[in-house]
Amino acid sequence: MNKTITALTIIMASFAANASVLPETPVPFKSGTGAIDNDTVYIGLGSAGTAWYKLDTQAKDKKWTALAAFPGGPRDQATSAFIDGNLYVFGGIGKNSEGLTQVFNDVHKYNPKTNSWVKLISHAPMGMAGHVTFVHNGKAYVTGGVNQNIFNGYFEDLNEAGKDSTAIDKINAHYFDKKAEDYFFNKFLLSFDPSTQQWSYAGESPWYGTAGAAVVNKGDKTWLINGEAKPGLRTDAVFELDFTGNNLKWNKLAPVSSPDGVAGGFAGISNDSLIFAGGAGFKGSRENYQNGKNYAHEGLKKSYSADIHLWHNGKWDKSGELSQGRAY
């Protein structure tokens, strides 16, 4: 059994399976990525820098083991997936050779047998940050995420502004004061075939792209839960991708974390029920946006949800709370 997860779902999966039996991560872990191959969990990047670790959840002596360092430099918001015994890492946010923050669209492959990395000669047709990745029928699928040109341009402007607070305020106002559709978040579904290292168009959402959604995949169905609709504005939407019969259908389920929604939440499956927990957002931002304020989160404080929601029998129910609000 191969599963695709993000760093966000590792905590949720551990929570559902009784997290007390697993050792703490080797370093405080945030904004990284991870994947499960059979019973072994792999995590890396984010606050771990270029480090990667693995944990055999069935071992008698459960402990994290350090792996070869990632060759592409420290990155946040990369995603990863196991396919045919190899780990693939997609995109992320990091520093380029000039020291500027940018979105990457590259792919790296890790071979557990040789404990080695290789950068593939393959680039997605768009940047990959805030995106989600899942596996279906031997291919990796990617959707969502920020627009590479807009995001990179924002950080180029901030770099040029230096410590000029007036210029920075002007840049932020210009960046955040737009409608959601003007950020061009990715609503395309892309497929990556590891046998050819080629990217292909696989469809697109009939609604809109999100960034920082939680993703859950089981069989022919994948769920995208909440996320950003634009910088600072979340959505409470839940999308379902159904591959049944090799005919991709997009469905919209009942919302959760209403009315403002969250980004960077945790999600997983337990006893055939979909679980969604945590996430961060700005209370009041949705109302501001609906009232015509594009810079919807201006002046609002980011809050972290502790709520645990369960999707069962066609509806969401609050089933408990995390020990504290958390996200990413």
Predicted regions span which residues?
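Gram-negative bacterial Sec-dependent N-terminal signal peptides
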Residues: M1-N18
